[in-house]
Amino acid sequence: MVISSLSNSQPLNAPVSSSPITQELANNLILTTLNDLYNWARLSSLWPLLYGTSCCFIEFACLIGSRFDFDRFGLVPRSSPRQADLIITAGTVTMKMAPSLVRLYEQMPDPKYVIAMGACTITGGMFSTDSYSTVRGVDKLIPVDVYLPGCPPKPEAIIDAVIKLRKKVAQEQTAERRGIEQIHRYFTLSHRLQPVSPILTGQYLQAETRQAPPRELATGLDTLVPRSLEANYIERF
């Protein structure tokens, strides 16, 4: 009887919608104070994962020195993704490295953040036009919170990116944290590449189609003849 009394233009509420009591409780004075304290503790102890694949990582390594001293921001470099909540992708990401990067990101505990450092990480950089193995943007693999352009960015720019990330962490709310979990931030698309056996096996010197150079050439250049070619020299000469 209640449904029939409603007009057709008036939408019905979903039966599984969140309770208004829970939404009001998230805006409670005590909980908001605890939320600010929780965000302050997290933004003061960001532990980055060392992930450098190219020349941009050299600029990031300059921050470890006493001149810039990024320890004052609470940044403690970690070598394990299970102990890090920030990953700074510094350098080019290739197709072969993409599954490993996604695996490292999935192993990081929530909440976690990503800083894309350098042109090669953001758009592919100078490899984006004629490279067959470069990923055109790391945001196709993992979600990015702060983009840091440059080739390479200066250490001062990296510090500015960390400060912007700290501001973002400080403004997060408890009710919004459900929407930034790992299952809601990106969708993993499995590639369609077919793994094949490697072409360069190291046995090309023993191939039947290889023509051995004459012994006079090796003797004149004072080079040692490989043992794998000695049999061919004996047969030919």
From Swiss-Prot:
Cofactor binding note from Swiss-Prot or TrEMBL:
Binds 1 [4Fe-4S] cluster.
GO terms under biological process: aerobic respiration; electron transport coupled proton transport; photosynthesis, light reaction
Summarize the protein's role. Answer: NDH shuttles electrons from NAD(P)H:plastoquinone, via FMN and iron-sulfur (Fe-S) centers, to quinones in the photosynthetic chain and possibly in a chloroplast respiratory chain. The immediate electron acceptor for the enzyme in this species is believed to be plastoquinone. Couples the redox reaction to proton translocation, and thus conserves the redox energy in a proton gradient.
Keywords in alphabetical order: 4Fe-4S, Chloroplast, Iron, Iron-sulfur, Membrane, Metal-binding, NAD, NADP, Plastid, Plastoquinone, Quinone, Thylakoid, Translocase, Transport
What does the subunit section of this Swiss-Prot or TrEMBL entry state?
NDH is composed of at least 16 different subunits, 5 of which are encoded in the nucleus.
Which gene underlies this protein? ndhK
Q: Name one GO cellular component term.
A: chloroplast thylakoid membrane
Q: What is the protein's membrane topology class?
A: Peripheral membrane protein
Q: Which organism is this protein's natural source?
A: Nephroselmis olivacea (Green alga)
Q: List the Pfam families.
A: Oxidored_q6
Question: What NCBIfam families does the record point to?
Answer: nuoB_fam, PRK06411.1
As for family, the record states: Belongs to the complex I 20 kDa subunit family.
EC assignment? 7.1.1.-
Can you name this protein?
Answer: NAD(P)H-quinone oxidoreductase subunit K, chloroplastic
| Compartment(s) of residence | Plastid, Chloroplast thylakoid membrane
Q: Which reaction does it catalyse?
A: a plastoquinone + NADH + (n+1) H(+)(in) = a plastoquinol + NAD(+) + n H(+)(out); a plastoquinone + NADPH + (n+1) H(+)(in) = a plastoquinol + NADP(+) + n H(+)(out)
Tell me yes or no: is Nucleotide-binding among this UniProt entry's keywords: no
